[in-house]
Amino acid sequence: MARMSFVHLHVHSNYSLLDGASSLQRLVRTAKSLGQEALALTDHGNMFGALHFQKVCSAEGIKAIIGCELYVAPESRFDRSEHTIGRRYYHLIVLAKNETGYRNLMVLSSKAYIEGMYYKPRVDDELLAQHAEGLICLSSCLAGQLPYLLLQGRKREAEEHARKYRALFGVDNYFIEVQDHGLDEEKKVAPLLIELACRLGIPLVVTNDVHYAEQEDSVAQDILLCIGTKKNRSDPNRLKFKTDEFYLKSSEKMAQLFPHYPEMVLNTVRIAQRCNVRIPQPGPLLPLYQIPHEFSSKEHYIRHLVHRGLYDRYAVVSEEIKARADYELDVIVRMDFVGYFLIVWDFITWAKEHDIPVGPGRGSGASSIVAYALKITDIDPLRYKLLFERFMNPERISMPDFDIDFCFERRQEVIEYVRARYGNDNVGQIITFGTLKPKAAIRDVGRVLDIPLSEVLMITKLMPDDPKLTFKKAYESEQLAQMKQEPRYAELFQIAEKLEDTNRNTSLHAAGIVIGKTALTDYVPLYKDSKTGKISTQFGMDLIEDCGLVKMDFLGLKTLTLIQRTQNLVRRKGGKYTTFSISDISDQDPTTFSMLAEGKSAAVFQFESRGMQGILKRAKPSKMEDLIALNALYRPGPMAFIDQYIESKRDPGKIKYPDPCLEDILSETYGVIVYQEQVMQVAQRIAGFSLGEADILRRAMGKKKLAVMQEKKKEFAERAEKQGFDKKHAENIFEILIPFAGYGFNKSHATAYSVVAYQTAFLKANFPAEFMAANLSNEINSAEKLPLYMAEAEKMGLSIQKPDVNASEPYFSVCEGCIVYGLLGIKGLGEQVAFDVFDERIRNGPYTSFVEVLDRVPATSLNKKNAEIMIKAGCFDRFGVTRASLTAHLDDAMKYVARKKAVTSSRQASLFDETDLGECSEYTFPVMEEWSQRERLRIEKELMGYYISGHPLDEYRSVIGEKATLDLGHIENARSENKYLIVGVLNAIHPYTTKSGKNMAFGSFEDLHGSVDIVVFPVLWEEHRAQFLPETIMGLVGTVDFSKETPAFLVDSVIDLEQLRFAQVKTILAGSEHRRVSSGEKTPLQKRGVSQEVHIEVSSHVRAHAQFKSLYEILSAHTGGSGEVFLHMHVDDRTYVVYVPSCKVSATEVFAQQLKGNESFVQILKECVQ
C-alpha cells in the first residue's frame, strides 16, 4: 500500500492505567515498523501521556495526534445518582486539530476530574458545547452512546444523538466510528452504524481499539486487567477482552476489515492530515512578583534586600563578601531570574515570620551568598567554600532550583500562603505515577495466576530492595536466574517482565508545587487526587517546566519538626533556657563531638544507621567539616574511599595529592576527592577551566559517554599544557577525576544536611530527655519506630514514666528529667479524648479520682472504649484502684456519672435518693485482685509497643545475668564467628516455607536491653517448633549475622527456662552443633571501630568461681578503657569464647605484666594486646 495509507486514531497506552499494556515507546516504534507515519493517543479520560507521546513521536519521526477518550455523563456531569437505565458514562473520542483544540481538550480533561468525577472523570454535553472548537470527534467503540442506542433498538434516539453531535462539533468534525475485533456486538452494530452514517451524510472511519502493541501482548494485557479489577485469572466472572484483536494492526489488515468501504480507511489519513498540534513548550514563565512602589525595578529591590541582608549576616562586610554578592547578583540579573529569587524569598520570609521551621538549605542552592543574605538559606558559602557555579552556571542557562525543607506538620500552611498569594487557579501540585517494578510485578502477577503467596514471597526475597531494580539486574542473582528456568514459574516471569515499568497508579509528588503566570489550565491539563481532593498537573515532574510552569519543591522534613519540639521542651525548663534557640548553639560543642566519636548517633539525622555509627567510631569527627565529608562519603560508590579518608585523617603522612598544587583544594578531605565541587576546582586549577566550564565538564564525566569523554580528555590535557603541566600528567589527573565526577557528592547539600545533623546531635548530647521525648512524639503513630526509640531512651539511661492522667500530655513530655508517656502514643486511643483530658486538667486542675475524670471529660470523647484503653494503659493507677476493678466496674461507674449529670442538669434531686448519689468522688470501686504481672505487661505491650511498668524478664534478671553471654543492647559488639547464649522473651514467630518445601521460621526476640530478629532453620524448627510460642521466655544459642544492615541471630539450639536455671553455660554451649571455635583454635584480634579487644586464655584446670578471683581483681583495676574482654576457656578438649559484658579495660603494659604474673592459670593471647 502507499505510504500514509492508514492511521490508528483510537489508541490506549499504559497511561490508561491497568488497561493499556504498552508503553508509548513500544506503540510508536511498532507503528513506525508498520510503515505508519502518524499515530493518535487517546487514553481513557486523561492526557497523562500527551507531551511525553509528542516527544517520543518526534524522536521516531512519527506525527503525533493528541487526543483523549472522554467519559461522557448521560446527563449532567454534576449528577452523582445511579441510573437504572443506560450507563454511568459513555465513551467519546476527541482529537485536537490545532492549538485551540488542544487547549479545549485540556479544559475538558481538567473539568472532568475536578467537576465530573463519579467512578470516572466525566464531561457532559454542556462542557462539550463550550469547548468543541478545534476538536474532531469520533463516536467511539461499543461503549459509546451511539452504538449503545442502536444495539438497544432505539434508532430514533440514535439519529438524534448523531445529529446533535454533528451540530455540536461541526459538519466536518464528527465521524461515525466502526470497529471489528471479532465481537458479536460489533458485527451486529456495524451495519446499523454504516446505514445511519450514509443516511445522514456523516463520514465513517474505521479504528482498532488498541490496548497493546502486538497481538502476542494480549495475555499480558489480560493479566493487567485482573490486577486492576483485583481478580484472579481463574475467575470465570471477571472482566476480560473476548478476543486478542485489540492491537496495533497493519494498514493492510485494517483495510481488510470493511473492504467495501475504502473511505473508512482514507478518512483516517484525512483526519491525521488535519490534526496539526505541537504542544507549546515555552519553558518556565515566572509569575509576576509585585515589588514595593518605592523601588524602580525588581533588580533595584533585590539589590536593596541583599545589601541589607549582608549586614545582618556578617559582623564585618569585607570586600570579598561584597564582590561575591555582586558577582552572583550580576549572574541572576543577566539570566533574568530575579523574580524567582524574590518569589522564594517571599514565602520563606512569611514562613519564618509565622514560626514555621525552615531548613538551613538543601541541594546546591546553599552555595549562594545571595540566598544566604536573603535568609533563603542559613549556610555561609564562604565559610564552607561552596561554589555558586554549582547552583547557577553562567555558561549554561537553566532554571535555578531551590529545594526547601519545612516543618513536616506545617508545610501545608506555606503552600496555602502561596496559593493565596498567586491565585488558587495558578497553583497546584504535581502528579506522579507508580509503576510495576520487578518485585511488585511478581507479587501482582503471582496473585493473578493463583501462585501461593509463600512461593511468591520466596521469589521476591531473592530480589534486593532497590527502587532502580530491573529484571535484568535481578537475574544477576544465580538463585533467581535458576528459578526463572523452572517450568512452574515460566509464565510468571514472562508476563511480569512484559509488564515491567507499566504505570500502575497515580499519586501526588511528595514535595512538588507548580506556580503559573496565569491559570494552570493555560499550560497543562489538571487532575484531582481522589484521596486528598488536591489539584495537580496531569504531566509529571520532568515535563511541567517545559510547558511554562515554575516548579518549587516544598519538602516536609520531620527532623525540623523534631528540632522544634525539642527546642520547645528545653524552653519549658525555664531560667536560662527560656529563650533557647537552636540557631544560637555553638558548632564546636565538645560534648556533641565526644558523643559522635563514640558512635552514639542513634536518632541523629543522617547518622543513625548502624553502619554510620561504626564509621563515626573509627573517624572520630571533631569539627563540622568532618561531618560534612562523612555524610558525603557514606553512600554507594564513594563508600569505597572511607578507609583511605580515615587513615589519612589519622596519619597525615599517608595523604597523597594528585599534584602538589591541589593541596589547598583537597586538604580538608585529607587528599580524597569527596565533592563534585572539588572536581570543578581541580579542573580550574589544572586546565584553566572557568568554574562554569568545569561544571559542564563534571556533568559530561558523570554521564560516562565514551566519545564525549575522549573529546573532553583531549581538551583537558591541551589546556593543562598551556597552564604549564605535563600532558601525560594532566591525562592521569583526568582519569583520577572520572570516578569522582560520578561518585562525588554535592558539597552544598552535604553541608546543609550536616548542619541539621549536628543540631540534632547537639540536642541529644546536651538535652537527652527532651530530645528523645521529641523523637517519640515525632513517631507517635509509628508502631515500628516508637518501641525502637523507647529502647534507645532506656539505653541512654533515661526513665520513661507510664501514662498518667495527671501527668501525661497528648504528646511525650519531660518532667524532672524523666520522659512522660504521651496519651496519643496509646494504641487505639482517640485523638480528641487525649486533648480533652489534657485541656480539662489545665483549665480546672488535677483529677482526684477515676470517677471525677468521667465526670469532667465529655462522655462523647471519653466513651467506654477510650476509658477502657486508658485503664489498661495504666493512666489511672495513681488513684489506688486496680486495673482489674476499674475494668470490671466501668459500666457501673459510667452509669453513676450519667445519673449524677442528669440530676445536676435537671435540678430534680428528689427523683433520686441522695445517698445513692453523693459526690462523684465518693463512688467506691469494689476491691479486686490485680491482674498478674505477665497479663498486665502483655496488655501494655499491645497498647504501647513496649513494656512500661516492668518487664516479663524482671524476675529472671539473676538468671540472665549469670547465664547470658550476649546483651542484645550491645549486639554490635558481638563477633560473627562466636557462639552466644541469649536469654529473653519471644515476641513473634513467623513460619516460612523454603523453595525446596522445607519449613523454617523468622521471629523477633527481646531481652532486658534490646531486641533482635531471629532465624530458625528447618532442622531445629521441625524438632522444636512447639517451644517457639510468642511470649515464651527461653534461651537461644547461636551466632550473629552481620551481613545485612540490621544484625540477625541465627539459632542453633533452644533452651527452656528450667534447663536454663540449672545448666552451666559451658554445658549449654557444648550442646550446640556447628561450633565456630574448636579445640586448640586461637581467635585473632579483630578491631571494631577503634575499640580494642583483649583475649585472655584461661588454663584448663580453672573451674570454680573462686579461682577467677585474682583475674577479676586485675580486670577491675584496669577498667575505664576501650578494650573489650573475651575469655578463652578450655573444656573437654574444646575451646569456648565468652564475652565479659560491661567490662572494658585499658590494655597497657602494666596490665599485661600483671596478667603474666599469674601464668599458673592465665596467659594473654599475644596478638591481642597492642
Swiss-Prot record:
Q: What is its EC number?
A: 2.7.7.7
Task: Identify the main location.
Answer: cytoplasm
Q: Which Pfam families match?
A: DNA_pol3_alpha, DNA_pol3_finger, HHH_6, PHP
The source's domain of life comes to: Bacteria
Please tell me one Gene Ontology term that the record gives under cellular component: cytoplasm
Instruction: Please provide the Gene Ontology terms (biological process) for this protein.
Output: DNA replication
InterPro entries attached to this UniProt entry: DNA_pol3_alpha_NTPase_dom, DNA_pol3_alpha_thumb_dom, DNA_pol3_finger, DnaE2/DnaE/PolC, DNAPol_HHH, PHP_dom, Pol/His_phosphatase_N, Pol/histidinol_Pase-like
**Main EC class the enzyme belongs to:** transferase
Among the GO molecular function terms of this UniProt record, one is: 3'-5' exonuclease activity
TM ranges = none
Q: Where in the cell is it found?
A: Cytoplasm
UniProt keywords, alphabetically: Cytoplasm, DNA replication, DNA-directed DNA polymerase, Nucleotidyltransferase, Transferase
Q: According to the UniProt record, which cysteines are disulfide-bonded?
A: none
Q: Which reaction does it catalyse?
A: DNA(n) + a 2'-deoxyribonucleoside 5'-triphosphate = DNA(n+1) + diphosphate
The subunit structure is: DNA polymerase III contains a core (composed of alpha, epsilon and theta chains) that associates with a tau subunit. This core dimerizes to form the PolIII' complex. PolIII' associates with the gamma complex (composed of gamma, delta, delta', psi and chi chains) and with the beta chain to form the complete DNA polymerase III complex.
Give the similarity note. Answer: Belongs to the DNA polymerase type-C family. DnaE subfamily.
Q: Which NCBIfam families match?
A: polc, PRK05673.1, PRK06826.1
According to its UniProt entry, the function of this protein is described as: DNA polymerase III is a complex, multichain enzyme responsible for most of the replicative synthesis in bacteria. This DNA polymerase also exhibits 3' to 5' exonuclease activity. The alpha chain is the DNA polymerase.
What name does UniProt use for this protein?
Answer: DNA polymerase III subunit alpha
Where does this protein come from, organism-wise? Treponema pallidum (strain Nichols)
State the organism's lineage: Bacteria, Pseudomonadati, Spirochaetota, Spirochaetia, Spirochaetales
